[in-house]
Amino acid sequence: MTDNPWLIMMINMTIVFGVLIVLGILMVLIHAVDPTKKVQGKKKPVVAKPAPSAAASKRQEEEKVAAMAAVLALVQDEDDMIAAALSAAIAEHKRKMEPMNLPHHSF
């Protein structure tokens, strides 16, 4: 039996890397003989769609811009509504908490 830590390390690392190599080879063999692998058929070529006309493209762009403007207006209105509801909730909370006369702590 040896007490040399370098020799023990080399033996351990040889065993570890040997096991890893064997597992890697086993994985390659399993992938090569995999019975559950689906058979890939020939892929059909993708047919390119014709380009839309300039008028249709312009109309689609206008519709997109209008939709974006509507969404932005809606979001702005929602933000205002949320801010108003939050302000009302804070005011209601303050109104309910004032009569309790809780001690104020200063840290």
Curated annotation (Swiss-Prot):
The keyword Ligase does not apply. It comes from the Bacteria. It catalyses: (2E)-glutaconyl-CoA + Na(+)(in) + H(+) = (2E)-butenoyl-CoA + Na(+)(out) + CO2. Its EC number is 7.2.4.5. Signal peptide: none annotated. It is found in: Cell membrane. GO terms for molecular function: glutaconyl-CoA decarboxylase activity; sodium ion transmembrane transporter activity. Heterooctamer consisting of two alpha, two beta, two gamma and two delta subunits. Belongs to the OadG family. This is Glutaconyl-CoA decarboxylase subunit delta. It comes from Acidaminococcus fermentans (strain ATCC 25085 / DSM 20731 / CCUG 9996 / CIP 106432 / VR4). The lineage of its organism: Bacteria, Bacillati, Bacillota, Negativicutes, Acidaminococcales. The gene is gcdD.
